[in-house]
Amino acid sequence: MERVWFAKLTNKGTIKIGYISFILLSLLCQSLIGLVNADFNYEGCYSAADIQSAGLSLKNSYIYQSVSYCQNQCPESAVVALFNGSDCYCGNSVSFLTSLTKSTDSNCGTKCSGWPYQMCGGSSYMNVYVNAETFVSSVESSSSKEGSSTSYMPSTTSSLSSAQISSTTRRTSTDMKSSEMIATTVSTTSTTSSSTSSTTSSTTSSTTSSTTSSTTSSSTSSTTSSTTSSTTSSTTSSTTSSTTSSTTSSTTSSTTSIFSVTSSSSSITLSSSEHTTVDSRTSSPSSTLVPVSSSSSTLSTPKVTSMTPSTSSTIPIVTSVELVTSVVTKAIVSTSDQHQETIFVTRTSVVERSSEVATATAAASNNRSNSTSKQRLSGGAIAGIVIGVVFGVIFIILILLFLIWRRRKSHDQLDLEETKHYQPYSFGDEDANPIGPPPSSGTTNWMRHSRGNTAGSIGTSNMYGFSMSNGANYSSPSSNTSGSIINNLAGLQDATVQKQNLPSTVFEEANTLNSANERFSANSLPDMMMSGPLQVVNPDNPDNPELSSTVSHNRA
């Protein structure tokens, strides 16, 4: 009964321990899956044809495919996509997603072959995941700038005297200022004006207009950018008075400066180009010196571009760009038949000041990205952890069951009834009553007899457990006469009387058993502990004189 109860208890304990182990394993798997998926964000469901045309390559086709397994196969990729439940695609750019149309998630309803609780695309659609830790190492933006164009619109006034025509030389200076910034697209028109003048004075006014807009944006998944735009307009007028005689001038001016902006990490590099325009004029032999004008403009405009991340981590770049533009106009006029040349030189220099905060943020993001990449676990590592936990739990359960069984076995009480031979005067020995008297009544070990003593080793003088002290020898009836038989019976009676003074022979065993649980036969111990010898209570032949004399003698 106790063993049946113990078996039931063991089965119940095994079921409870197995249930707890299953819960722990489930929690461990969920935490590991969450750790692996922490670096990727779900972007949406897109058409498989569009994703494949964007350059994503097939990484593997796995019968036990899952979202985490696909992401572990492409740890350094910017985007991963799952198709038809078992195919995994990887890509290194996310810019193509802005030009694609997102589909509904119902089109990506195919379950993953290795983990049916997640969706892995559809028959013609893909689930797309974007790596949130991907650092946008370079932002390419093209910016072009066309220089200011000057339109000369001369107007003439004929109100001069002959004295002024003879020889008059005047010099004027024109100051021209232009403001320019980094621009994505700036369109400028160049206007050419030509006039023929036969007067002694001319007034020239020039207007320079420059409109720039600055837009800087950096896009990652779920990122909003703020755009800073500025417009600068500058108008400069100049007046030139000169005394000429029959002068024909033709002016063509076009200056273009192109800037290319490339942003890599937190540094911006601008390249500038310098163009020179030559303005040729033809004058008559009586031409005089034309004034020389020069102008310069300096612009210092800080531009701040900030990005506010919503769900993913981006690196804000704060950069101050100082653009300095210098326009120098030189006019050289010679006499006689030589040509007049006007040279416009535009020089632009850029001074960059990058914020240290941007550099520190970029370095911190790079370190975090590297540490996160090192902390990723591969699919084999996850499988090994799960298998190790399962076998560890099973091993612990087996050890507990073995200890419980051993403890129960050690506490089981030994039943002496099962070890007995059910023989009278016996504690389980094969020889219930070995014949052999103690060596002497004075020794202390008279109860410790050797159980190897048998009747064959006892001589005629030590028969029936006692010695013939009277010197009578027992012999077989065939070799004795009637007188010798009577003598032997008399000696036997004397030996019986002497035996009454001897202690009873009790064959004890070592105290190796629990004395409280010992059980003995009902007929063994009481009879053996009596001081007198055994007697015949109901003799078969009460008329036998020998037995009657023996009984009466013992009673006396």
Curated annotation (Swiss-Prot):
Assign the protein's first listed, main location to one coarse class.
membrane
Q: Which residues form the WSC domain?
A: 39-132
Q: Which residue intervals make up region (Disordered)?
A: 142-257, 269-312, 425-444, 534-556
Signal peptide annotation = 1-38
The chain's Extracellular topological domains, given as residue ranges, are 39-384
Keyword DNA-binding assigned to the entry: answer is no
Locations of Low complexity compositional bias? 142-169, 184-257
Q: Which InterPro entries match?
A: Immunoregulatory_rcpt-like, WSC_carb-bd
> Which residues get glycosylated?
N84, N367, N370
What is any Pfam family matched here?
WSC
Looking at the record's lineage, which domain of life comes first? Answer: Eukaryota
UniProt-recorded Gene Ontology molecular function terms: transmembrane signaling receptor activity
Here the segments flagged for biased composition (Polar residues) are 546-556
What is the topology of this protein in the membrane according to its UniProt annotation? Single-pass type I membrane protein
Q: Please give the name of this protein.
A: Cell wall integrity and stress response component 3
Gene symbol of the encoding locus = WSC3
